[in-house]
Design a protein with these regions (language model features):
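Conserved Rossmann-fold NAD(P)-dependent oxidoreductase catalytic core, especially the SDR/UDP-sugar
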Residues: 89-130
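N-terminal Rossmann-fold NAD(P) dinucleotide-binding loop
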Residues: 12-13
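NAD(P)-dependent short-chain dehydrogenase/reductase
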Residues: 145, 155-191
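Catalytic helix-loop patch of NAD(P)-dependent Rossmann-fold dehydrogenases
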Residues: 115-158
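Alpha-helical substrate-binding/gating segment
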Residues: 173-182, 188-215
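C-terminal amphipathic/interface module of NAD(P)-dependent oxidoreductases
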Residues: 45-52, 249-286
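NAD(P)-cofactor binding segment of oxidoreductase domains
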Residues: 61-103, 137-140
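Mid/C-terminal beta-alpha module of Rossmann-like enzyme folds, strongest
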Residues: 200-252
Length: 286
């Protein structure tokens, strides 16, 4: 079968490897010739296109499954909406081939909850950040543009990812701990995390879903910020975390539930908590 990835970065390349190992043909959209060569070296067929330039999207190939995992480049000078909303709408409108199954990676920041309460897929979205607002709008446009007029033939899946960690994604935080840089956030606020391998497994499981749906992708246990950074410091030999106690950072965050992910989508987490996942991520980082 043929697969296409739009946004073949930290998560996308890991999904691509799984698909290649299963014997599928995998293509990925990229804007750069240099990155195209890198993709070829990984066994991935590059497709030179840019979601912000509709005229380039005519080359999108016909595939069986599409993973849309675009992230916003903060150095681009563009607002998140340009990437998440305008880019997605360009893709849906101007791509000549949309598959019968499309998986959209979104984020748990679509929720504006900051009182420490639990959220699930039925909790109303009311994002507090520009990125969260853009992702919430993109989800709405995804259902309208991809699925609404093709309900008999298409299955759309939205995966709202918690904060992703894994090999190579902890270096900046470890460096900050080692330098004893103050953390400007409420130490008692809640964090929701997922190991990258479990997000990849969620994508693979979403290929088997028989109905369109939205899933929160997070591990089994929300964790308070102080516990997370203390654990990270212990595992890396860094000093204990220092929090900036100016009284301004009072948000309690939210606690995400993965019940639907586990019970309905059938994902079996490899790393149910950071006690399982952090040691792997640290030891696998080169």
């Amino acid at each position: 079968m043929r697969k296409l990835i739009v946004g073949c970065g930290y998560v996308g390349r890991r999904v691509a490897k799984e698909w290649l190992d299963q014997g599928h043909e995998v293509s990925a959209v990229t804007r750069s010739a240099e990155n195209a060569n890198t993709l070829r070296s990984l066994g991935i067929e590059p497709v030179i296109a840019d979601i912000t330039r509709p005229e380039t999207l005519a080359v999108i190939p016909a595939v069986d499954t599409l993973l849309y995992a675009v992230s916003h480049d903060r150095s681009s000078g563009q607002p998140p909406r340009a990437t998440y909303v305008e880019g997605l709408n360009n893709f849906l409108k101007y791509s000549p081939n949309l598959p019968d199954r499309m998986i959209l990676i979104s984020t748990t920041s679509v929720y504006g909850v900051d009182d420490g309460s639990e959220v699930d897929e039925d909790t109303p979205t009311a994002a507090a950040t520009a990125s969260g607002q853009a992702n919430a709008e993109a989800e709405t446009d995804f259902w309208r543009g991809y699925w609404r007029n093709h309900q008999e033939s298409r299955i759309g899946i939205v995966l709202r990812s918690a904060g992703i960690y894994g090999p190579g994604r902890l270096l900046r935080r470890v460096s900050s701990l080692q330098n004893q840089e103050p953390i400007s956030a409420n130490p008692d606020g809640w964090l929701n995390l997922v190991h990258v391998d479990d997000l990849v497994q969620s994508v693979l499981q979403a290929e088997l879903a028989k109905e369109p749906d939205t899933y929160l992708v997070c591990d089994d246990r929300p964790i308070q910020r102080r516990e997370y950074y203390t654990k990270l410091a212990e595992l890396t030999g860094a000093p204990p975390p220092v929090f900036h106690a100016d009284g301004q950072e009072t948000s309690q965050g939210k606690r995400c539930s993965n019940r639907r992910l586990i019970e309905t989508l059938g994902v079996k987490l490899r790393y149910p908590t950071i006690d399982d996942g952090l040691p792997h991520a640290i030891h696998s980082t080169t």
